[in-house]
Amino acid sequence: MQTALDFLKEHYEVAFATCEDNRPKLRLFQIMRHQGTTLYFATSTQKAVYSQLVANPHVEILAVDGKVSVRCEGCVDFDVDDEYKRWIYDNNPVLPRLYSSYDKLVYFALRIEVMDYYDLRPTPPILRHFDLRAGTETGGFVGERFMKGDK
């Protein structure tokens, strides 16, 4: 699991998926801070993504670099400590250029519930599935040539 979390630290620009009217909505987002299996983000209450998150807090993110990817799902929570909000604002060079103060933004945490790590470089490719709710980790292979039981 640590390999997948480290990948997210190095690849902080992610595809961020929400839902509106039963239709997927996808955009690029930056992971602003990590704390174990919790990822922190910031946005504006004026953006559609904020309304989408309030209506349905279930999200997925995807980070990709070449043949390696990490996909996470979970629910967002807007209850973020003020200390974290200030840190995010102070440590992101883009936010002060766009907003006059840290309190002009809304911050939210994504507590990872499910995470998949894919590495298509080796043969057979690697798949690690982490269900943090159940506390389980499973592995597998990608592709019919590597399915268990096949000869």
Show the residue positions of the predicted features.
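Short, surface-exposed linear segments at secondary-structure transitions and domain or protein termini
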Residues: 37, 81-85, 137-139
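Residue-level detector of flexible, active-site-proximal loop/helix-junction positions
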Residues: 23, 68, 122
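Short beta-strand segments
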Residues: 11-45, 51-53, 59-63, 71-73
